[in-house]
Amino acid sequence: MQYNLTRIDPDAPNDQYPIGERETVSDPLEDQVHKNIYMGKLEDVLSGAVNWGRKNSLWPYNFGLSCCYVEMTTAFTAPHDIARFGAEVIRASPRQADFMVIAGTCFIKMAPIIQRLYEQMLEPKWVISMGSCANSGGMYDIYSVVQGVDKFLPVDVYVPGCPPRPEAFLQGLMLLQESIGKERRPLSWVVGDQGVYRAEMPSQKEQRREQRIAVTNLRSPDEV
């Protein structure tokens, strides 16, 4: 599996975001996994256990921008029970949150505030873009709406829909957990170059393309 290695670039200008450089590398542990004797650091062996704890204890930051936030909060109710995935502990401060959900329309005036909140979150941190407006601006192709939050934030998971159902948000959370389980990052909080390895996760559209092309009998609107 290929990984995206992100390193902080200290010589980058201050107005560049994200401040860092990326390159595609192979799994740093792949060469050692199939050997009888493992020659490496103990922290590399513990990465799997630590990632398991991280992905099953994700604390979301409680804020929303528009109607998609209503669908997000619905996932916390009893019928959907987001506590099954360990993400029911909503935090009111970004300093205590693990991931941020951009749920709704992101206006240009709101973009610097969202970026400031993201910068206040401690590593490790992740971002879920929920809904068409957050993904690409949605129906608002106008000057006042940012055409996708990935213009100024590193997005880990995109959840399509206008608005997405709570089940779609839960599926996006599961995809984020899968991605976190394959990450390689330091086991402690450090300042500076962290050398974070993120797995290259193919999109669901690419994974299900052959299955959808093979469909010959389309359902009528009455059967949907």
From Swiss-Prot:
<comment type="subunit">
    <text>NDH-1 is composed of 13 different subunits. Subunits NuoB, CD, E, F, and G constitute the peripheral sector of the complex.</text>
</comment>
<dbReference type="GO" id="GO:0009060">
    <property type="term" value="P:aerobic respiration"/>
</dbReference>
<dbReference type="InterPro" id="IPR006138">
    <property type="entry name" value="NADH_UQ_OxRdtase_20Kd_su"/>
</dbReference>
<feature type="binding site">
    <location>
        <position position="67"/>
    </location>
    <ligand>
        <name>[4Fe-4S] cluster</name>
    </ligand>
</feature>
<keyword id="KW-0520">NAD</keyword>
<comment type="similarity">
    <text>Belongs to the complex I 20 kDa subunit family.</text>
</comment>
<keyword id="KW-0830">Ubiquinone</keyword>
<keyword id="KW-0479">Metal-binding</keyword>
<keyword id="KW-0813">Transport</keyword>
<dbReference type="GO" id="GO:0005506">
    <property type="term" value="F:iron ion binding"/>
</dbReference>
<feature type="compositionally biased region" description="Basic and acidic residues">
    <location>
        <begin position="203"/>
        <end position="212"/>
    </location>
</feature>
<protein>
    <recommendedName>
        <fullName>NADH-quinone oxidoreductase subunit B</fullName>
        <ecNumber>7.1.1.-</ecNumber>
    </recommendedName>
</protein>
<dbReference type="GO" id="GO:0005886">
    <property type="term" value="C:plasma membrane"/>
</dbReference>
<feature type="binding site">
    <location>
        <position position="162"/>
    </location>
    <ligand>
        <name>[4Fe-4S] cluster</name>
    </ligand>
</feature>
<feature type="binding site">
    <location>
        <position position="133"/>
    </location>
    <ligand>
        <name>[4Fe-4S] cluster</name>
    </ligand>
</feature>
<feature type="binding site">
    <location>
        <position position="68"/>
    </location>
    <ligand>
        <name>[4Fe-4S] cluster</name>
    </ligand>
</feature>
<comment type="function">
    <text>NDH-1 shuttles electrons from NADH, via FMN and iron-sulfur (Fe-S) centers, to quinones in the respiratory chain. The immediate electron acceptor for the enzyme in this species is believed to be ubiquinone. Couples the redox reaction to proton translocation (for every two electrons transferred, four hydrogen ions are translocated across the cytoplasmic membrane), and thus conserves the redox energy in a proton gradient.</text>
</comment>
<dbReference type="InterPro" id="IPR006137">
    <property type="entry name" value="NADH_UbQ_OxRdtase-like_20kDa"/>
</dbReference>
<dbReference type="GO" id="GO:0008137">
    <property type="term" value="F:NADH dehydrogenase (ubiquinone) activity"/>
</dbReference>
<dbReference type="GO" id="GO:0050136">
    <property type="term" value="F:NADH:ubiquinone reductase (non-electrogenic) activity"/>
</dbReference>
<keyword id="KW-1003">Cell membrane</keyword>
<dbReference type="GO" id="GO:0048038">
    <property type="term" value="F:quinone binding"/>
</dbReference>
<keyword id="KW-0472">Membrane</keyword>
<keyword id="KW-0411">Iron-sulfur</keyword>
<dbReference type="GO" id="GO:0045271">
    <property type="term" value="C:respiratory chain complex I"/>
</dbReference>
<dbReference type="Pfam" id="PF01058">
    <property type="entry name" value="Oxidored_q6"/>
</dbReference>
<dbReference type="GO" id="GO:0015990">
    <property type="term" value="P:electron transport coupled proton transport"/>
</dbReference>
<keyword id="KW-0997">Cell inner membrane</keyword>
<keyword id="KW-0408">Iron</keyword>
<dbReference type="GO" id="GO:0051539">
    <property type="term" value="F:4 iron, 4 sulfur cluster binding"/>
</dbReference>
<keyword id="KW-0874">Quinone</keyword>
<keyword id="KW-1278">Translocase</keyword>
<keyword id="KW-0004">4Fe-4S</keyword>
<feature type="region of interest" description="Disordered">
    <location>
        <begin position="201"/>
        <end position="224"/>
    </location>
</feature>
